[in-house]
Amino acid sequence: MRYTAVIRTLGNAGMYYQKTLESIAQQTIKPDRIIVYLAESYEIPKETIGVERYIYVPKGMVAQRALSYYEVDTEYILFLDDDVYLPPEAVSRLYNELQQYNANVISPCTFQNHKQRTLSKVFKAITGKERPMFTNNRWSYKVMRTAGFAYNNNPSKPVYESQSNAGPCFFCKKNDFLNISFGEELWLDKTYYALPEDQVMFYKMYKKGLKVLTSFDSGIVHLDAGTTMQSNPERECRLVFSEYRNKLIFWHRFIFLPDHNPLSRFMSVLALGYALTIQFIKCIVYFLIGKSKTAKAFFDGINDAKCYLKSDEYKSLPLI
C-alpha cells in the first residue's frame, strides 16, 4: 500500500506542527511524500523534518482541502491538520481496519463526545446540537434532523460505521475523495469559521455511497483540541454567526432537499424549528444579561443563510 500524507495549515501551529511531522516520519508504513498545502500569503513555518513539499493554495478550511491533488500519485491519501499526533502503527491500523470492514473512508475518534460530563451532555441534547445514543451497536455518529449529530455513548468495539466524524485526520483513496466534489461546499468558507465543515464532508461521503468508519483504537490525538476556540466576546459572536448560518444551509441542502417524503420533510422542519426555538430562548437570556451582540449574531447568521438560499449561486449547486 502506497500513500501520500497531505497537511493543510496556516503555518503557525508551532510545536504541534513539528510533532505532526515527526509522527508521520515514524510510521511503520511511511508515506511516499509529505505535501503541505499552505494558505497564500503565509510564511513557510520554521518547523521541519527536511522532506516536506510546500504548495500555496487559497486560504480556507474547505479551500485547503477541496483540491485536485494533481501532485499526489499514490492510491491512498492520509489527510491531516497541522496539530495531530500519530503513533507509529497508526496508518497501518487505519489501513487494516479499512480493509477488514470493506470500507472507503476511516477517521480516528479525536473528539470523545461520549466522555463529556453528564451536565454537558444533557445541555447539548436539549439544544439539539448533539445527543448520546445508548443502544446503537452499529453507528459511531449519525446526523440528526436538527442538523446536529448523535454519538455512540458507550463505544465497546474498535470500529463503527459513521455518518460524520471529526476531520483533523482521515484516510481514504484519492479517487473516493475527489468523487464527492467537496469544492461544491465552498460556501462554508464565507464565514469567520467554516464549521461544521467536517460534518458536511463526511456526511456528503455517506450520501454519495461511501462507507465511512470511525476508529476508536488508533491512538491518534488531536493535539490542539479545545484550545483554538477559547472564547472572547468577539470570537463568540463570530462563532454563533458562523454556526447558525452554516447549519441552516447544511440542513436545507443535505437534509431537507434530498428528502422527497412529505411526512419526513415535515418532521425535519419540526426538528429544525425546535433547535432554532431553543437558541431563540438563549438569545433572550443573552439580552437580559447584556450580551446583545451575541444574540444579534444569531439573527444575522440566520438572515445571511436565508439570503444565500435564495441566491443564484446556491441554486446552481448540484443537488445531493
Regions found by a protein language model. Give the residues of each.
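Acidic donor-binding segment of Leloir-type glycosyltransferases
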Residues: 21-56
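Glycine-rich, basic loop-to-helix element that forms the pyrophosphate-binding segment
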Residues: 56-72
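Short aromatic/hydrophobic "clamp" motif used to bind/position activated sugar donors
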Residues: 77
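Conserved donor NDP-sugar-binding/catalytic core segment of glycosyltransferases
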Residues: 89-136
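A recurrent flexible, glycine/aromatic-enriched loop bordering the glycosyltransferase active site
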Residues: 138-146, 151-172, 193-194
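Acidic donor-binding loop at a coil-to-helix junction in glycosyltransferase catalytic cores
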Residues: 165-167, 188-203
